[in-house]
Amino acid sequence: MEFRYDFSDYKKSDFDPKAQAERVLISVHADSDVNEDKEVARKRLGYALKEVERQITDLIVHEETTLTKNVSSSLNAQSYLQDIEGKLEQLMLVYERIRSLVVIPSENLGPLHEAIVNLHSTYMTLYWLGEFFGIQAKLFPLFQGSINENEKLSRYYQASLLLQESDQLLSRFPLMKRQSSVSLLLKLNITNRSRIIKETSSYLLSQEDQLSFSVNSNGFTNACSVLYMLDKYLLEQDLTRLLSSRIQKAIIQFDSIFQLSPTTRRLLHNSTDPSAANSTIWSKFEDGWYQISKIGAQCVFWERSLQKANICNPDYPNLLEYFQMQPNFILDGATICIYFFKELAISISSKMQMLDRRDPILLRVFRSDFQRVTHIVEQAIARSSSEIVNKDTRECSIVMNSLRVLAPKNP
């Protein structure tokens, strides 16, 4: 007689060892009430159980080979390998105990049922240990070799995905942590995780003064994705610092427009022909907004980089929308560009009101040609986004509203 025990569903959450045991008994007609049939069934069941034992042995040999290969490819330390081999020997002993439990039942399913349950539990542990070491085999090479910044961030992104996968695996099967080899690898993972977080955060903060960026660079996207996976709070801190720094720099740049040299101010106030002073003032205004446009371009780059990061799927379409939805994050539902120009506009409005009281002669220069003011501001905002914008663009409306004090006053 030939019986084939079905191991195909050992990974499924609805695996039913009792049903498997019943299937064995039914296959040998052990449910008959006739004594003669019971004797025949016992003999048939004996053959069936021997076949199950043979299949158990085959599984052990196959999984031991697979697991050892995984470990050999991922670990160089001989002590690790010896430890794994010791664990495999222990598993073999467990299987021997299971085999000894597989006895021919006379009246009930108890011994066979218990044996199959133990078989399932042990085999699950063996299988997921193999999966865990397979993850480690992919993880270790990502920290080796000298590479450039973008390639390193790409590797850190892959490593973060694997660390997440490892965490999920251990949360589903926490008993694996009792294996000393797993504990050693977890300590190494903690070290690598800290390294990734530290270096990725340093990269993000280094972008604070980076005004040249490649259109094809995924470094910023990968860095944000990595911190989203490993430390969301630190990612929020870093982005808050970056945006606050850019806003402060833009405010300082705008304030510098109205810081006139003594010569220019003397020409503006005392000269019968203030054209020279006016020319200098307009030049400072144009240059100031050009510098602001470069800062705005950086915000646009960050915004688009976050839009490309879809690591937060399916909860959010991309990281930009994730941050927009966070109740305690500075964006408060706005895009990065809108937030940048809104904060800048608040400072501009305050500055304009102060100058209107203290330096009306300086503002008279801009009031004389408000159309030129509008053109310079709109072009600066357009330049920051590399898109054609008009007076209906929200960013333009926000900024121009803060400059309304420069508009000619109706008589």
UniProtKB/Swiss-Prot annotation:
One GO-annotated biological process of the protein: intra-Golgi vesicle-mediated transport
The organism's place on the tree of life at top rank: Eukaryota
Pfam families, per database record: COG5_C (PF20649), COG5_N (PF10392)
Protein's UniProt keywords contain Ribosomal protein: no
This protein's UniProt keywords: Cytoplasm, Golgi apparatus, Membrane, Protein transport, Transport
InterPro entries documented for this protein: Cog5, COG5_helical, COG5_N
Membrane topology term: Peripheral membrane protein
Cellular localization per UniProt: Cytoplasm; Golgi apparatus membrane
Keyword Membrane among UniProt keywords: yes
Gene Ontology CC entries for this record: cytosol; Golgi apparatus; Golgi membrane; Golgi transport complex
Biological role stated in the UniProt entry: Acts as essential component of the peripheral membrane COG complex that is involved in intra-Golgi protein trafficking. COG is located at the cis-Golgi, and regulates tethering of retrograde intra-Golgi vesicles and possibly a number of other membrane trafficking events.
PANTHER family: CONSERVED OLIGOMERIC GOLGI COMPLEX COMPONENT 5, CONSERVED OLIGOMERIC GOLGI COMPLEX SUBUNIT 5
Assembly, per entry: Component of the conserved oligomeric Golgi (COG) complex which consists of eight different proteins cog1-cog8.
Similarity comment: family membership: Belongs to the COG5 family.
Name of this chain's protein: Conserved oligomeric Golgi complex subunit 5
